[in-house]
Regions:
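Conserved catalytic-core segment of nucleotide-activated headgroup transferases in glycan assembly
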Residues: 16-19, 124-195
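Extended catalytic core of nucleotide-activated donor transferases of GT-like folds
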Residues: 35, 41-111
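Short alpha-helical segment that forms part of, or immediately flanks, the ligand-binding pocket
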Residues: 199, 222-226, 240-241
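Short hydrophobic beta-strand element within catalytic cores of glycosyltransferases
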Residues: 230-233
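A charged, aromatic-enriched C-terminal amphipathic alpha-helix characteristic of glycosyltransferases
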Residues: 271-308
Length: 311
């Protein structure tokens, strides 16, 4: 049986796409036959992957396939519901999942039997919203070989504005107004760059402003922790799964006065250095120990052993 992962266009830089490829790679390493479908048969250029790519023409009613589908695309789910093969959802954001369900009672209406969940938060949602389907947690992973501190850190605040562009501009403007003593700190935007460049920029920065929003998990703040940044900002809700008072200066969603305070706390923790900063990094390392490539591969194996044993 060939496991076929349906992937959005790989020209879009999106962490969810990366994990689709990583899961296909893990399955291949574990002895399964897995491929990634991309409508144009294109391989991503913004991260490296060894997963085989297939394009149009692979789908047929008599193919020995199992399809892994996105949670947020009702047209795709509806089209694949007509095919007799088994179907699994890979849910990486339960908020966006409401877009995919359309008017169906639950995912089983599309012939789906199992849901792979990239976080405990998504898993809990799926057990509530789709109680008749089997669900599994396959934790996201941070690659420590990729995301690590630079040899020399700079007085830089890194941020990814994709989900909160207006908020990013507002926070940056208010920060320089309220804290003029830190106007010499540079702001480094991370947008539309590949994984290697994103990791490089995080590695150089001392502080990372988390602009997470409506996340199923929110991997970027963890990548920032692995890169040696002090993280300050929003959890995006999904980030509550790992956010603690020890591993970041976290604030409630859309509390902008609080995020400005959190940001200056991150700056001043770096400037103070010493035992307090070391304690912070130790807390980050403890958090990251649950989100390793090894934990991801184990989650993949445990879930797929059950999925493939159920006909």
């Amino acid at each position: 049986m060939k496991i076929v992962f349906f992937c959005p266009p790989v020209s879009v830089i999106n962490g969810g796409i990366k994990h689709i490829f990583r899961m296909a790679e893990a399955l291949i390493a574990q002895g399964c036959e897995a491929v990634v479908f991309e409508q144009n048969g294109q391989r991503p250029v913004w991260f490296a992957s060894t997963a085989p790519i297939v394009g149009q023409g692979i789908f047929s009613a008599d193919a020995d396939h199992l399809y892994v589908l996105p949670e947020d695309q009702p047209r795709i789910l509806s089209d694949f519901a007509r095919l007799p093969q088994r179907k699994v959802i890979y849910s990486q954001n339960h908020f966006y999942g409401a877009l995919g369900i359309a008017e169906a009672a639950d995912y089983s209406a599309y012939g789906v039997t199992d849901i792979l969940c990239s976080s405990r938060t998504i898993y809990d949602h799926c057990r509530l919203r789709h109680p008749g389907l089997r669900a599994y947690v396959v934790p996201c992973a941070v690659d420590p070989a990729q995301f690590r501190p630079a040899a020399e850190k700079r007085n830089v605040i890194a941020f990814m504005p994709r989900k909160r562009a207006i908020e990013a501009a507002y926070i940056r403007d208010m920060f320089r107004f309220i804290y003029p003593q830190y106007r010499d700190w540079a702001w480094m935007e991370i947008a539309e760059v590949g994984e290697i460049e994103a990791a490089h920029r995080m590695g150089e920065a001392k502080v990372f402003l988390s602009l997470s929003r409506l996340e199923g998990f929110g991997l970027t703040p963890l990548e920032a922790m692995a890169s040696g940044c002090v993280v300050a900002g929003f959890t995006g809700i999904g980030g509550r799964e790992y956010a603690t008072q020890d591993n970041g200066f976290w604030v409630s969603e859309d509390d902008f006065p609080a995020v400005l305070t959190a940001l200056v706390q991150g700056v001043e923790l770096n400037l103070a250095a010493g035992a307090a900063l070391e304690k912070y990094h130790n807390a980050c390392h403890k958090t990251l120990s649950s989100f390793t490539p090894e934990a991801f591969r184990k989650g993949v194996k445990d879930a797929w052993d059950i999925i493939l044993s159920n006909k």
